[in-house]
Amino acid sequence: MIGLTRVILRLGRNPDAGFPDGDDNYGYVIQAPLDADGRLDAALWREKKAQCTVRRFHPREAAADGWLRLRGETWYFWYDEEDEGPAEPVFKLGAHELRPGEYITVREGDGDILTFRVAEAVRI
């Protein structure tokens, strides 16, 4: 069975949200259970969910630490402290290949829907 992968997401171009060129200083670092195709592996997540972490970074906010969670078919980022914000669902995350150059959409805790680029995916 394949282990965890460190995936770094960086804010992609989001002109309607005020980021016409994206922002490499805004994103997420995820320890994710990926299969050989680069997709999330729910069975591996169940075995290693305590190690499946998320860290949100932003130039104007404190970092937020939490976990990658699965509820039904929906993957989301869950934060354990109120000041870090509510859970953030990720649109069809289970269907995406998390490989460099791919894009995913995150509904952030403030309701903004933003596109992020997979900048890095390294087995750990």
Annotate the PLM regions.
Residues 1-46, 58:
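N-terminal intrinsically disordered, low-complexity, charge/repeat-rich segments that act as generic
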Residues 2-3, 70-73, 98-102:
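A short, compositionally biased
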Residues 6-8, 27-31, 76, 103-105, ...:
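Ordered hydrophobic segments in well-structured contexts
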Residues 10-12, 31-35, 71, 78-80, ...:
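A structural detector for beta-sheet-dominated domains
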Residues 28-32, 64-70, 116:
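Broad, structure-driven detector of short, well-ordered beta-strand segments within folded domains
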Residues 49-89:
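Short beta-strand/loop turn elements enriched in aromatics
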Residues 78-124:
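Short, compact, well-ordered microdomains
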